[in-house]
């Protein structure tokens, strides 16, 4: 594992302010990554505070285990299983804040052996947990054109998804796509229009990565389970990096911040009325990175921080 990778956490200051950190509070970092946000929380909480962290990437867990602090604990798991983690630690209904920093980390992107980057040549893997599921190479080889087309279109919003899907399967008739630059070359040849501002492989790599890791389903489950863990007044802060992620977060917060409407005069029992009362969240803010941060950390450009609070 490359320990020299430079990592700058996105909107670190804004995240800490949005979580409204309490000195004796209990917090969960659902996406530890390289620990930038976690370390900021540890610096802010007091002696009685606690920080629990989760990451599906064993390399991130290795980094987390180097933190020798009695207030901190990390496990190797998916953040969709945050409820199980909270049950085990007896903190359901006691958590003051939860954060998710979605997408890939610098640890994954900058390591060519992980296969996430279209700018670095390495094995075409893309798994956030290299010990679970199948690699991108294996999935592309086994999948049919329609499946690949669906993934590229829906998870990458790729304009030339059909052309790229056909090109991939044509190549796979001869051999597997073993490395990232092989896939980049296939995409470049299948893409008729060149955009000097955007790499032609960007959306395809995003789509395959999202599908391989079931990222959107992870987000949905993680958000729903977070509501069962927070204490009243507890906050949920999420940083997303593209429209698919942000749409899920936005819709989730909108869903749980609206009051249910019942047509006037409609007979309804008290029990039924209680099930309709889903107004659990108060939306706190939506924050974008400053121009200064974008200049310092270009990765922050597309990020959005949304925060909501569980109602008292």
From Swiss-Prot:
Q: Which Gene3D superfamilies match?
A: Putative methyltransferase TM0872, insert domain, Vaccinia Virus protein VP39
Q: Which of this chain's residues are annotated to bind S-adenosyl-L-methionine?
A: 35-37, 55, 79, 101, 108
Q: Name one GO cellular component term.
A: cytoplasm
Show the stretches that span the lipid bilayer: none
Name the top EC class.
transferase
Answer whether the UniProt record assigns the keyword tRNA-binding to this protein: no
Q: Which GO terms describe its biological process?
A: rRNA base methylation
PANTHER family of this UniProt entry? 12S RRNA N4-METHYLCYTIDINE METHYLTRANSFERASE (PTHR11265:SF0), S-ADENOSYL-METHYLTRANSFERASE MRAW (PTHR11265)
Quote the function comment for this protein: Specifically methylates the N4 position of cytidine in position 1402 (C1402) of 16S rRNA.
Instruction: Indicate what this protein is called per its UniProt record.
Output: Ribosomal RNA small subunit methyltransferase H
Which species does the entry assign this protein to?
Buchnera aphidicola subsp. Schizaphis graminum (strain Sg)
Lineage summary? Bacteria, Pseudomonadati, Pseudomonadota, Gammaproteobacteria, Enterobacterales
